[in-house]
Swiss-Prot record:
The gene is HFE. Residues 331-348 are cytoplasmic. Residues 115-205 are annotated as: Alpha-2. Disulfide bonds join C124-C187, C225-C282. Gene3D superfamilies: Immunoglobulins, MHC class I-like antigen recognition-like. It is found in: Cell membrane. This is Hereditary hemochromatosis protein homolog. Residues 206-297 are annotated as: Alpha-3. Binds to transferrin receptor (TFR) and reduces its affinity for iron-loaded transferrin. Residues 207-296 form the Ig-like C1-type domain. Belongs to the MHC class I family. PANTHER family: HEREDITARY HEMOCHROMATOSIS PROTEIN (PTHR16675:SF172), MHC CLASS I-RELATED (PTHR16675). GO terms for biological process: iron ion transport; regulation of iron ion transport; response to iron ion starvation.
């Protein structure tokens, strides 16, 4: 894995982690992803930023251009010029903050002469009841490093090497209060503004296409429930046995991933006893559905036909051999009868 792949992989893991932390249906999120490299040989600028609303990329910025650039049609237009002015100013400020933090972390690691990467993810979620949750995390060289705790205004170190930076940043209470104000006030306000701009696009709801497939490998029978082409990505999938929930520990689930066309996909698999497939049902809940959708595995016509043909051939083969055996027995009986008559006649 190359140097650039490591921060990209780190961001992918962070996105999944944040999304997996209990996001309820119909919630919305605003995320900013920052990354940078101390040397150009990593293929990254000193600072690069990407902004997402509900996991839809809408803005990009880098240290060289120092300008916010649109990545979505719904934020284009002269009417939104004020938005881009504010975004550019905010990202310039984060550009400066990121570089200062980068040098601080490198100095605390005695890495000033080496090439390293820094990654940051920050943002907020607004739930259906208008409650909010903020997050602000740092990763260094592709590993979790520091996380801001807005409730206590301190930093949580993910590794021992981060303790020096943690103690240094916790002295600056002004910055901690500014961070909390952004996560709890500014970020939710900006998210609501962006949701208004993206009305009709961001609030669309495409229900999932759900199907259950059957797989047999190494004497293990597995049912796989697939949810395809849905939007937004908030979805709940569970297995039921005789209409009762199955323990989640028994199921294997896949993270919700983009399909490449603006929709999402996911699946959940469950190993079941052979012959009991019809006792299991996949239940799916999604904002695009008026009520939970259920699906079961239905044997395909081709499988039924093949089974019938094989069974028919087997029956025919059995009947054929029984017929041959019957004829052989008849011939033997006839031969024995003829021999008996011959002997009796000779005795007379």
């Amino acid at each position: 894995m190359g140097p650039r792949a490591r921060p990209a992989l780190f961001f992918l893991i962070l996105l999944r982690t944040v999304a997996a932390q209990g996001r309820p249906p119909r919630s919305h999120s605003l995320r900013y992803l920052f990354m940078g490299a101390s040397e150009r040989d990593h293929g990254l600028p000193l600072f690069e930023a990407l902004g997402y609303v509900d996991d839809e990329l809408f803005v990009a910025y880098n240290h060289e251009s120092r300008r916010a650039e649109s990545r979505a049609q719904w934020v284009l237009g002269e009417a939104h010029s004020q938005l881009w002015l504010q975004l550019t100013q905010s990202l310039k400020g984060w550009d400066h903050m990121f570089i200062v933090d980068f040098w601080t972390i490198m100095d605390n690691h005695n890495h000033s002469k080496e090439s390293h990467t820094l990654q940051v993810i920050l943002g907020c979620e607004v739930q259906e009841d208008n409650s909010t949750r903020g997050f602000w995390k740092y990763g260094y060289d592709g590993q979790d490093h520091l996380e801001f705790c807005p409730e206590t205004l301190d930093w949580r170190a993910a590794e021992s090497r981060a303790l020096t930076t943690k103690l240094e940043w916790e002295v600056n209470k002004i910055r901690a209060k500014q961070n909390r104000a952004y996560l709890e006030r500014d970020c939710p306000e900006q998210l609501q503004w962006l949701l208004e701009l993206g009305r009709g696009v961001l609030d669309q709801q495409v229900p999932p296409l759900v199907k259950v497939t059957h797989h047999v490998a190494s004497a293990v029978t597995t049912l796989r429930c697939q949810a395809l082409n849905f939007y937004p990505q908030n979805i709940t999938m569970r297995w039921l046995k005789d209409r009762k929930p199955v323990d989640v520990k028994d199921a294997e689930s896949k993270d919700v991933l983009p399909s490449g066309d603006g929709t999402y996909q996911s699946w959940e698999a469950l190993a079941v006893p052979p012959g009991e497939e019809q006792r299991y049902t996949c239940q799916v809940e999604h904002p695009g559905l008026d009520q939970p959708l259920t699906a079961t595995w239905e044997p395909s016509l081709s499988n039924t036909l093949v089974t019938g043909v094989i069974s028919g051939i087997a029956v025919c083969v059995i009947i054929f051999f029984i017929g041959i055996l019957f004829r052989i027995l008849r011939k033997r009986q006839a031969s024995r009868g003829a021999m008996g008559d011959y002997v009796l006649a000779e005795c007379e």
